[in-house]
Amino acid sequence: MTLLAKRQERSIVPRMYYITTAIDYTNGPPHIGHAYEKVLADVLARWHRMKGEEVYFLTGVDQHGQKVQQTAEKLGITPQEHVNNITGQFLALWDRLGISNDGWASTTDPRHKACVQKILTDLKDKGQLYKKSYKGFYSVRQEQFLTDKERDAEGNFGPEWGEVVELEEENWYFRLTDHVEWMKQFVEKSSDFVLPSFRKTEVLNAIDFDSDLCISRPKSRLSWGIEF
């Protein structure tokens, strides 16, 4: 009887379910794509709550970056004023759509800044960050350096990359290539980590990195970010 009671107790313990969305970029106002993602996440959160599971649904905004800085300059206002305005539009839309998120994250939040700085400091202390100079082509729209993989058959960068400029600068890099093998093994061995399962190959290809990740920008080019 005692064993049966314990099994019954374990069976009614609610399952924890965590849902997070992309954090929306605040260089411009929300559009249908933003709403589509949040509504899907909200449906998922409500469904798991109906099943009696404990849900934490997190969404938010990315308020830093070169595009935000450039947009604010064009409008003649500060980046903070610009992101405050755009963030207000996102929040108003989620309220109108009845999005039932439990948490809200913004990259200008002091808690977020402190967390990022702590993580980067720990990674640096563990030898996972290093500085190097790099010369290459940079997409202003996507805020990333491009490689030959991003060129089309004619050797050009497609319109999806927007303005592409050639840059040479020193930045901090994360040793992402050190982690490729264990990430691939984790995805391959986990039966329910990627759903639907037919997307597993796509995920494995996406994490098959052949270069480390650039994680910083020089202050001379970008002043609106988290200092490291």
Regions found by a protein language model. Name each.
Residues 2-5:
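Ala/Thr-enriched low-complexity intrinsically disordered regions
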Residues 97-106, 124-137, 149-151, 166-167, ...:
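Short secondary-structure capping/junction motifs at helix and strand boundaries
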